[in-house]
Amino acid sequence: MLAHQTSLARRTCLTQLGVGALLVSRSSSALAAAEPNSQAELLSRRLPTTGIEVTLPPLADNSNAIPLQFTLQAPAGQQLVGFEIIAPENPNRVILRFKLGQAQARLSFSTRIRLAMTQEVWVLAHLSNGSSLGRPTHTVVTATACFDET
């Protein structure tokens, strides 16, 4: 009798694990579909670029710590409610996503980012009316090397 109960409990547990794995895989694919997938998709949105000033070096020799600074200015009558930094060629495209606790008309931000390769980094600003602003900035990532002729 005990062997039958253990077998039943094991089957129930394995069934529940399978259902859980299925739900997790579906939710992660839905999340991936909700994020911008490519440079082409970001360009197709034709976001206005006014009010976004981005400073990113045109050439970076250390892809692990590239300085990025930007200033966001909301259009008249609007407020900034959040922003994102997106690198479409990185394995994880969304580098940073902030939702502001208090809407602001102007925001300055500075950080260091990691890039997988040469690409355009996008700064997206989300406004209180549900619209967005976006600006791409191109940077070339090189690999530094030491050449020894010995």
Locate predicted features.
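N-terminal secretory signal peptides and thylakoid transit peptides that target proteins
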Residues: M1-A21
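Transition segment at domain starts
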Residues: L31-N62, V94-K99
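Short edge beta-strand/loop segments characteristic of extracellular beta-sandwich folds
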Residues: P67-A74
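An anionic, turn-rich surface loop/hairpin at beta-sheet edges
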Residues: P91-R114
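Extracellular Ig-like/FN3 beta-sandwich strand-entry sites
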Residues: A116-E120
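Short acidic/polar inter-strand loop motif in beta-rich domains
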Residues: S128-G134
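Short beta-strand edge segments in extracellular beta-sheet folds
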Residues: H138-T144
